[in-house]
Curated annotation (Swiss-Prot):
Stated family: Belongs to the ClpX chaperone family. HslU subfamily.
Record's keyword annotation contains Nucleotide-binding: yes
Protein name: ATP-dependent protease ATPase subunit HslU
Lineage: Bacteria, Pseudomonadati, Pseudomonadota, Alphaproteobacteria, Hyphomicrobiales
Protein residues bound to ATP: 18, 60-65, 246, 311, 383
Single GO MF descriptor: ATP binding
An annotated GO BP: protein unfolding
Cellular compartment(s): Cytoplasm
Gene Ontology CC: HslUV protease complex
InterPro entries in UniProt: AAA+_ATPase (IPR003593), ATP-dep_Clp_protease_ClpX (IPR050052), ATPase_AAA_core (IPR003959), Clp_ATPase_C (IPR019489), HslU (IPR004491), P-loop_NTPase (IPR027417)
Gene that this polypeptide is encoded by: hslU
Organism expressing this protein natively: Nitrobacter hamburgensis (strain DSM 10229 / NCIMB 13809 / X14)
Job description of the protein: ATPase subunit of a proteasome-like degradation complex; this subunit has chaperone activity. The binding of ATP and its subsequent hydrolysis by HslU are essential for unfolding of protein substrates subsequently hydrolyzed by HslV. HslU recognizes the N-terminal part of its protein substrates and unfolds these before they are guided to HslV for hydrolysis.
Length: 433
């Protein structure tokens, strides 16, 4: 779990996302409150519940990007799901409890990776012995093994091919149980029923260097206590889990519609107990959702937040409105983030030996065109910049392999020549930009 202060979290998000200070502050405070709760003891820790967040803002302004970056920062079980993928319990499709089951799987993966590092030294020695067995046989003399061990550690045998027995990574066969709700629940793995009897192995032919990582992971897993690992993962989900629920506006029931809808209002009703706090059964054990943080987001360009069920609105007490992007924001998005679009295209063309020299007035022109098209056609926010950049650099991208060693200067005139007329023609830009 992260120990960053809210200020540090915001500055980390600033490296990748332009503007949206209110949203960054809200998620940074929520993340820090997870740490604060862990410092409490006794009954007070149980009483402190997370304050769930609803992010409202037009498409393409950074809602999903905040979630992506937060996942890397959080150092806690984190899952991003789209609300539109779920249906009401009892109907064909995924029910919302699958969110928690997926979150547990994420936590188990994270916990396993962390614990593997603790036993890595012992696992590497065991993996080395298995490689030596494959090279010289299990019955070779100690002198022969030592000789090959020295060569192995020096890297002299890295390209040599060996045959090793590895655990089969292919999942056990699945079969459907008719009548069980939800495709994910109805599909039962034979491996889950019969346990890990004997475990399936297969022989693979690999180079020494490629086999090493596989063997180290296998030996690490043998040294880990799977029951303890699962318990730690479930505890991490219950105390530090974060669920980012995207596209929540798409499950609103708008005015004028009557009757429930299994993929709209029904999903909202199913979300109520999950967000409020319930116990979800998973194949690893029961998981309580009382302290899982839910961050919901939606564009709400057709529906309104008030179209959500009142009970669901009450369970998302912190509202954050993200601002539409201005021309200056567009300009900053092109240049400021660590992996900005300009830097990406320059790096891509560099692989072909072509150097792009993009001037400041070209960046101004790109931002102006993106804003103009957004205002006349459909406002899709920063995503419009990708469309505009692709059109401007289309010729260069196509001919780059034949222009090795060239430097191409892109200024405002170049931008206008390649896209200016298209942007002015509203009918054409509606279909092309």
């Amino acid at each position: 779990m992260t120990h960053f202060s809210p200020r540090e979290i915001v500055s980390e998000l600033d490296r990748f996302i332009v503007g949206q200070t209110d949203a960054k502050r809200a998620v940074s405070i929520a993340l820090r409150n997870r740490w604060r709760r862990q410092q409490l003891t006794g009954s007070m820790r149980e009483e402190v519940l997370p304050k769930n967040i609803l992010m409202i803002g037009p498409t393409g302004v950074g809602k999903t990007e905040i979630a992506r970056r937060l996942a890397k920062l959080a150092n806690a079980p984190f899952i991003k799901v789209e609300a539109t993928k779920f249906t009401e319990v009892g109907y064909v499709g995924r029910d919302v409890e699958q969110i928690v089951r997926d979150l547990v799987e994420v936590a188990i993966g994270q916990t396993r990776e962390r614990k593997r590092k603790d036993v890595q030294a012992r696992a590497q020695l065991a993996a080395e012995e298995r490689v030596l067995d494959a090279l010289v046989g299990a019955n070779a003399s100690a002198a022969t093994r030592d000789s090959f061990r020295r060569k192995l550690r020096a890297g002299d045998l890295n390209d040599k091919e060996i045959e090793i027995e590895t655990q089969s990574s292919g999942g056990a066969p699945m079969f459907e149980i008719p009548g069980m709700p939800g495709a994910q629940v109805g599909a039962i793995s034979i491996g889950d029923i019969f346990g890990k009897m004997g475990g399936r192995t297969k022989t693979r032919r690999l180079t020494v260097v490629d086999s090493y990582e596989i063997l180290v992971n296998e030996e690490s897993d043998k040294l880990l206590d799977s029951d303890q690992l699962t318990q730690e993962a479930i505890a991490a989900v219950e105390n530090n889990g974060i669920v980012f629920l995207d596209e929540i506006d798409k499950i609103c029931v708008r005015d004028g519609r009557s009757g429930g809808d299994v993929s709209r209002e029904g999903v909202q009703r199913d979300l109520l107990p999950l967000i409020e706090g319930t116990t979800v059964s998973t194949k690893h054990g029961a998981v309580k959702t009382d302290h899982i943080l839910f961050i919901a987001s939606g564009a709400f360009h057709i529906a309104k937040p008030s179209d959500l069920l009142p009970e669901l609105q009450g369970r998302l007490p912190i509202r954050v409105e993200l601002d539409a992007l201005t021309r200056n924001d567009m300009r900053r998005i092109l240049t400021e983030p660590e992996a900005s679009l300009i830097k990406q295209y320059v790096a891509l063309m560099q692989t072909e030996g072509v150097t792009l020299d993009i001037t400041d007035d070209a960046i101004d022109a790109l931002a102006d065109i993106a804003v103009a098209v957004n205002s006349t056609v459909e406002n899709i926010g920063a995503r419009r910049l990708q469309t505009v950049m692709e059109r401007v650099l289309d010729d260069i991208s196509f001919s780059a392999p034949d222009r090795n060693g060239e430097t191409v200067r892109i200024d405002a005139g170049y931008v206008q020549k390649h896209i200016g007329d298209l942007a002015k023609n509203a009918d054409l830009s509606r279909f092309i930009l």
